[in-house]
């Protein structure tokens, strides 16, 4: 096959590499509706991008490849089962080219941790290929491609804080007047998003009396974010999936309790879990609480983070000027 037929990138793709940093997310509010006919659940959520970043580098290559290093790297597939791989194929298909890139991902976001690390990496691949190949695909089209890949991928492009509706892919920017400080507690294992959603369906079908009432309007959360006051935000944090995550991984109750005992304003399971996120009064308080939590024996590791931060962005190349 020659380069002239448009199916290879060899004669017109710039050489080199592009690196993109992309954040994980915490769901400050996650209202899960009933299961829809298409298998998805209707969601209303407040996404919040935090400073736990994966770094994704995309290079020109003879064929598509994928490698990981860092957090949970050994457990991740390096083929079409990986969302980052599928993102490369989708972008290439969108512009009529072969996906001839080598993808290297340095993981910091936990795998299967409820922080959308896989979605973040997919978003980063879209941004990196758009830059590497000098495509000029507009942000609106990148968002549409992201939505084809998964519900959380558009927010990884968007970043900041956003209200998500539909299955989470329809986004509206949320005004946030402050930097919020978090302690993130990683669990020894992961939780399957599909299994957590199935568990909340089961608990609801059985009318489990331990289930808390479903969340109401997100408006108080949005008002607290606009105020910039973590003490106002703390009692409003909520996650309809948390009872399902606790049902599948009861040890998370100890983690949540330990974070509050250490002085966090509030704690909740992030998304489908099992990562637990603790809101703190300040950066200094987050360091102290993280230190206490790390020594409590209730989680695998602890990270301190802040938000909101921007979504997937190209890392500027180092200056070569003398």
Swiss-Prot record:
**Which terms does the record give in the GO molecular function aspect?**
4-(cytidine 5'-diphospho)-2-C-methyl-D-erythritol kinase activity; ATP binding
Q: Which reaction(s) does its UniProt entry say it catalyses?
A: 4-CDP-2-C-methyl-D-erythritol + ATP = 4-CDP-2-C-methyl-D-erythritol 2-phosphate + ADP + H(+)
Q: What is its EC number?
A: 2.7.1.148
Q: What top-level class of enzyme does the UniProt entry assign?
A: transferase
Q: What are the protein's UniProt keywords?
A: ATP-binding, Isoprene biosynthesis, Kinase, Nucleotide-binding, Transferase
Which residues are annotated as active site?
25, 152
The answer to whether keyword Transmembrane helix applies is no
Pathway in which the depicted protein is active = Isoprenoid biosynthesis; isopentenyl diphosphate biosynthesis via DXP pathway; isopentenyl diphosphate from 1-deoxy-D-xylulose 5-phosphate: step 3/6
- Chain residues that bind ATP: 110-120
- HAMAP family given in the database record: IspE (MF_00061)
Kindly give the NCBIfam families that the UniProt entry links to this protein.
ispE (TIGR00154), PRK03188.1 (NF002870)
State the family it belongs to. Belongs to the GHMP kinase family. IspE subfamily.
Per the entry, what this protein does is: Catalyzes the phosphorylation of the position 2 hydroxy group of 4-diphosphocytidyl-2C-methyl-D-erythritol.
Can you name this protein? 4-diphosphocytidyl-2-C-methyl-D-erythritol kinase
Organism encoding this protein: Mycolicibacterium gilvum (strain PYR-GCK) (Mycobacterium gilvum (strain PYR-GCK))
């Amino acid at each position: 096959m020659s380069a002239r037929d448009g199916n290879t990138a060899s004669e017109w793709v710039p050489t080199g590499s592009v690196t993109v940093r992309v954040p994980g997310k915490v769901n400050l509010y996650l209202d899960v509706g009933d299961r829809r006919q298409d298998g998805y659940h209707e969601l209303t959520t407040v996404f919040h991008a935090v400073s736990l970043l994966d770094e994704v580098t995309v290079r020109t290559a003879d064929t598509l490849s994928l490698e990981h290093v860092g957090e949970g790297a050994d457990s991740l597939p390096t083929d079409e089962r990986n969302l980052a791989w599928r993102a490369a194929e989708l972008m290439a298909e969108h512009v009529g080219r072969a996906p001839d890139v080598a993808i290297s991902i340095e993981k910091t976001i936990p795998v299967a941790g409820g922080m959308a690390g896989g979605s973040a990496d997919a978003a980063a691949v879209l941004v990196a290929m758009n830059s590497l190949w000098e495509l000029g695909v507009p942000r609106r089209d990148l968002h549409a491609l992201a939505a084809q890949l998964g519900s959380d991928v558009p927010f990884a492009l968007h970043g900041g804080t956003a209200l998500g509706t539909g299955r989470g892919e329809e986004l509206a920017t949320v005004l946030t007047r402050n930097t919020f400080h978090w302690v993130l507690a990683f669990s020894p294992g992961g939780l399957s998003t599909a299994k957590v959603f199935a568990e909340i369906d089961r608990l609801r079908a059985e009318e489990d009396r331990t289930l808390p009432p479903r969340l109401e309007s997100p408006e108080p959360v949005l008002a607290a974010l606009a105020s910039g006051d973590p003490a106002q935000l703390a009692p409003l944090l909520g996650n309809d999936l948390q009872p399902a995550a606790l049902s599948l991984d009861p040890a998370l109750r100890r983690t949540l309790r330990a974070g509050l005992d250490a002085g966090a304003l509030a704690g909740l399971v992030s998304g489908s879990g099992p990562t637990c996120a603790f809101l703190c009064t300040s950066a200094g308080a987050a360091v102290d609480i993280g230190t206490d939590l790390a020594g409590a024996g209730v989680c695998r590791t602890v990270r301190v983070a802040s938000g909101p931060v921007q979504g997937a962005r190209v890392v500027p190349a180092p200056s070569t000027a003398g």
